[in-house]
């Protein structure tokens, strides 16, 4: 998901 312009992958 994208949070604060940061892409995180589970």
Swiss-Prot record:
GO terms for molecular function: serine-type endopeptidase inhibitor activity. The keyword Cell cycle does not apply. Coiled coil: none annotated. It comes from the Eukaryota. The keyword Transferase does not apply. Keywords: Protease inhibitor, Serine protease inhibitor. Monomer. Belongs to the serpin family. Strongly inhibits trypsin and plasma enzyme(s) activity. This is Serine proteinase inhibitor. It comes from Halocynthia roretzi.
């Amino acid at each position: 998901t994208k949070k604060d312009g940061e892409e995180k992958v589970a």
